[in-house]
């Protein structure tokens, strides 16, 4: 029992030395969390032995010591991973590597250079909330670290990661509690972001724009099909189709002969005879084996870079994407899709490429 107070005193002395030194060396911050973990371990053991006081300190409950030890381990591991990147020498203080900073949104990322954004709910100066945005957010993956800048719009605070807009603060969540009218203003850097025009007032213009874009796409496809006359032809009436399905719905014969469709894509449709994957022909299109890699977007980004060193083991690989829905879904998980020429190539890929346990592998097929 005598050794626990002595060891605890030594650990706490070292922690105080780090506080007084106030170093911006990352190794010092790693040491700080190592010592914090050891302090919690000693408190845990003391309580287990029935010790209630060590000097003037009350020994906390075992559950408290265990929880704080887990937090210290989490910070220590994150800092050790950061220490392996090119940003290890940027200068890191105790405040920047504190538990409070680690838990601030976006959680479990290191952040620097915060600034305040004020949201005025109901356009009432007495009904405001302050939020912190960050000029530097360190997205720490398994093999690399990327710095992104926090941004703001009417809907919340966000950053871009691998082409994906990720909100880490949504003002609508607080609006449910503090807002009556459902309208607010965002004040940042002397500028005010107000509520955008309602969807209903723009329905006509939005529809017209969509139709215009579709028309332009069709025209472009028509040119790229390769007709001898490169001038755009005016729209013509479709020929009466002469193929009928079970519901008396008719389709042009030329679509079933694998000819290119001007108003769809420039690739055209692949017939059953043209498809190399004859075992999976459906609706006259060619299907290919695929896998979906599902997990944390940063882990997927890192994995995608590793996969690119095995280009002979797949055909195409997508950027990180995710499902969007009005229902409650975990949009924080990203998905990367990889296509293969055949089943043999997919199996060879899975045998060769090491995929982390944190990434879920979903096999399937996709029409191309």
UniProtKB/Swiss-Prot annotation:
Which residues does the annotated region (Disordered) include? Answer: 225-255
Q: Where is this region: DNA-binding domain?
A: 287-368
Report residues of the Glycyl lysine isopeptide (Lys-Gly) (interchain with G-Cter in SUMO) crosslink.
Answer: 294
Any Gene Ontology CC annotation: host cell nucleus
Query: What are the UniProt keywords, alphabetically?
Result: Activator, DNA replication, DNA-binding, Early protein, Host nucleus, Isopeptide bond, Phosphoprotein, Repressor, Transcription, Transcription regulation, Ubl conjugation
The keyword Manganese appears for this protein: no
Q: How is it modified after translation?
A: Phosphorylated.
Q: Which GO terms describe its molecular function?
A: DNA binding; DNA-binding transcription factor activity; nucleotide binding
The processes (GO biological process) annotated in the record are: DNA replication; DNA-templated transcription; regulation of DNA replication; viral DNA genome replication
Region named Transactivation domain: 1-200
> Where is this gene product found?
Host nucleus
Name the principal localization, coarsely classed.
host cell
Q: What does this protein do?
A: Plays a role in the initiation of viral DNA replication. A dimer of E2 interacts with a dimer of E1 in order to improve specificity of E1 DNA binding activity. Once the complex recognizes and binds DNA at specific sites, the E2 dimer is removed from DNA. E2 also regulates viral transcription through binding to the E2RE response element (5'-ACCNNNNNNGGT-3') present in multiple copies in the regulatory regions of the viral genome. Activates or represses transcription depending on E2RE's position with regards to proximal promoter elements including the TATA-box.
Listed under subunit, the entry gives:
Binds DNA as homodimer. Interacts with protein E1; this interaction greatly increases E1 DNA-binding activity. Interacts with protein L1; this interaction enhances E2-dependent replication and transcription activation. Interacts with protein L2; this interaction inhibits E2 transcriptional activity but not DNA replication function E2. Interacts with protein E7; this interaction inhibits E7 oncogenic activity. Interacts with host TAF1; this interaction modulates E2-dependent transcriptional regulation. Interacts with host BRD4; this interaction mediates E2 transcriptional activation function.
Please give the family membership noted in the entry.
Belongs to the papillomaviridae E2 protein family.
Q: Which protein are we looking at?
A: Regulatory protein E2
What is the organism field in this record?
Human papillomavirus 52
């Amino acid at each position: 029992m005598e050794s626990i107070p002595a060891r605890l005193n030594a650990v706490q002395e070292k922690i105080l030395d780090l506080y007084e030194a106030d170093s911006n060396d990352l190794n010092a911050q790693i040491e700080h969390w190592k010592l914090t973990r050891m302090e919690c371990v000693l408190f845990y053991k003391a309580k287990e032995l029935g010790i209630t006081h060590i000097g003037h300190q009350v020994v906390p409950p075992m559950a408290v010591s265990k929880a704080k030890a887990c937090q210290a381990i989490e910070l220590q591991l994150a800092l050790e991973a950061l220490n392996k990147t090119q940003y290890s020498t940027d200068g890191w203080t105790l405040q920047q590597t504190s538990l409070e900073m680690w838990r601030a949104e976006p959680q479990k990322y290191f952040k620097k250079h915060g600034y305040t954004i004020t949201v005025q709910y109901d356009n009432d100066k007495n009904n405001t909330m302050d939020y912190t945005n960050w000029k530097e957010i360190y997205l720490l993956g398994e093999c690399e670290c990327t710095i992104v800048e926090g941004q703001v719009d009417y809907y919340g605070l966000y950053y871009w990661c691998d082409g994906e807009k990720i909100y880490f603060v949504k003002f609508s969540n607080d609006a449910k509690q503090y807002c009556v009218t459902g309208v607010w203003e965002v004040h940042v850097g002397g500028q005010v972001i107000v509520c955008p025009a309602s969807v209903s007032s723009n329905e006509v213009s939005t529809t017209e724009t969509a139709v215009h874009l579709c028309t332009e796409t069709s025209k472009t496809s028509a040119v790229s099909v390769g007709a001898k006359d490169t001038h755009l032809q005016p729209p013509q009436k479709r020929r009466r189709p002469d193929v009928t399905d079970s519901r008396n719905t008719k389709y042009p014969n030329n679509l079933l002969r694998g000819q290119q469709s001007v108003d769809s894509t420039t690739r055209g449709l692949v017939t059953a005879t043209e498809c190399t994957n004859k075992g999976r022909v459906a609706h006259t299109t060619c299907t290919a084996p695929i896998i979906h890699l599902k997990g944390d977007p940063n882990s997927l980004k890192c994995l995608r870079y590793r996969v690119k060193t095995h280009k002979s083991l797949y055909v195409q690989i997508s950027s990180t994407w995710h499902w969007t829905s009005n229902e409650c879904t975990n949009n924080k998980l990203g998905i990367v899709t990889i296509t293969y020429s055949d089943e043999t190539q997919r199996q060879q890929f899975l045998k060769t490429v090491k995929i982390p346990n944190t990434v879920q592998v979903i096999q399937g097929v996709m029409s191309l």
